[in-house]
From Swiss-Prot:
UniProt: Mg(2+) binding residues: D39, H242, H244, N278
Keyword Lyase: no
GO molecular function, one term: 2-isopropylmalate synthase activity
Reported cofactor(s): Mg(2+)
Enzyme class: transferase
UniProt organism field: Helicobacter hepaticus (strain ATCC 51449 / 3B1)
Protein name as annotated: 2-isopropylmalate synthase
Gene symbol of the encoding locus: leuA
InterPro entries (alphabetical): 2-isopropylmalate_synth_dimer (IPR013709), AIPM/Hcit_synth_CS (IPR002034), Aldolase_TIM (IPR013785), IPM_Synthase (IPR005668), LeuA-like_post-cat (IPR054692), LeuA_allosteric_dom_sf (IPR036230), LeuA_N_DRE-TIM (IPR039371), PYR_CT (IPR000891)
Subcellular localization(s) per the UniProt record: Cytoplasm
Keywords recorded for this protein, A-Z: Amino-acid biosynthesis, Branched-chain amino acid biosynthesis, Cytoplasm, Leucine biosynthesis, Magnesium, Metal-binding, Transferase
Amino acid sequence: MSYTKYQRGYFMPPTPSLEWSKKEYIAKAPIWCSVDLRDGNQALITPMSLEEKITFFKLLLKVGFKEIEVGFPAASETEYRFLRTLIEEDLIPDDVSVQVLTQAREHIIKKTFESLEGCKNAIVHVYNSTSYAQREQVFRKSKDEIKHIACEGAICLKESAAATKGNFRFEYSPESFSGTEVDYALEVCNAVIDIFEPTLEKKLIINLPVTVEMSLPHIYASQVEYMSKHLKNRENVLISLHPHNDRGCAIADAELGLLAGADRIEGTLFGNGERTGNVDIITLAMNMHSHGVDPKLDFSNIPSICDVYEKVTKMQVYERQPYSGKLVFAAFSGSHQDAIAKGMAYHKEHNLSTWSVPYLPIDPKDVGRVYESDVIRINSQSGKGGIAYILHHHYGVNLPPLFREEFSYYVKNISDKAHKELSPDEICEIFQNDFVNLNNTLCVQDFHFTHIDSKPSQEFNVKLHILYAKENSKTQQEITGKGNGRLDSIANALREHLNLDFEIIDYSEHSLKKGSTSQAVSYVQIESKGKKCFGVGIDNDIITASIYGLVSALNRII
């Protein structure tokens, strides 16, 4: 790669101050404008049909957008027809403004206003390119000639609006602002402001697009701050930002630009747009949400938004897309899973009102995600905490600490051999099939206890019928034993009559559900010849569950 042919294509403001950098965070939501139906649509391999655009428009309304760019009606019959459909079928709410794009050319501007006939509220966005490269290479015009194009466009826009019924607001963009000398961009914008004569009731939007991203975000913020300080009639002007993502910094451009004085953001859902895309409004809004600032947009059901978006655009939301992707809250790492599980348990235990869970910047439920399926995910990298969390939430079992470790290794080994993630259902199936109520080699068919003494005590005799498979044959036997407690008497009987050498080294139990009809689950760990393993028993009766747990452990070790 030859880096020497490149040079920095941006321009620093004449007097950068960096006052914006003293601000800690964005304290209030900007005005949001979705450009999905124009900027986003023109970047699709297969542009949306009329019906798909209407579906998307309704989605944007549901999210809460009050300004929606709907197209370039003078340049495309499809976009003209879409705008007319919105107007004629009364699909635009009274509190929503549609935005249309036009070049600073008289015949295009007049056609644009024809398309707006009957529209209650509209923003007409006029632009012309002002960058050094475009002036020199594309238009081959001087600075004064480029400024004249902007001024003529503004005059034509103002006159056309006066001759057309409707409530129109105006927007001007020095396109390719990111490659324009900042003092020259200011000169052009101020000339346009003089023509439009904005008022407090009808403010002018000055849009400063990062048409192609060229600089670090703090440079763009300094450019925005300079414009904000030096624009004429600033109190009646809204500064809008339109960042693209060529250097991967569109979010940072927008956030620092807002700190620097911007009032408005143009962007798209999931950052769809030309080349590397526009700024992702969902990420911007949810970043504010995570700081306790109301973004004034509703992204409480991201999965549903993803479904509509993918259906109408034929695009896919990247699995790691901030806040939106299917894997953004997923924890496969064992240490992460353990920290998340403990953090969520701590929140529940202490009834905390503010969110602060390790590895989760926001509560996944805020965007319609589910802890059990979207947060704790199990593969060969997972740990005991995450696997135990899955079993607890999906199956109601609380694995004892020693069993968590054994079961996690067992599950991870299966995932590793299969080279895949395991679903909660698959984990529960492993637990049920390989640990619970096992009777493949040894089966206790029935049992009967009696106290050794006539008076009640903890010493019991037991008589039990077993089915024991050994050397390809099964034998049914009646055996007896005694011990200090029911489980001990069963263990002694099995040791003596089956020549099994083992010790019970850990035991715990709990109810699967609350109430008298709940099942009991027992965990029994045994050790035999230096090998340790757990078995699990589940039954309506706690004694039976404990016996099944012991037998399950024996079946796993013999």
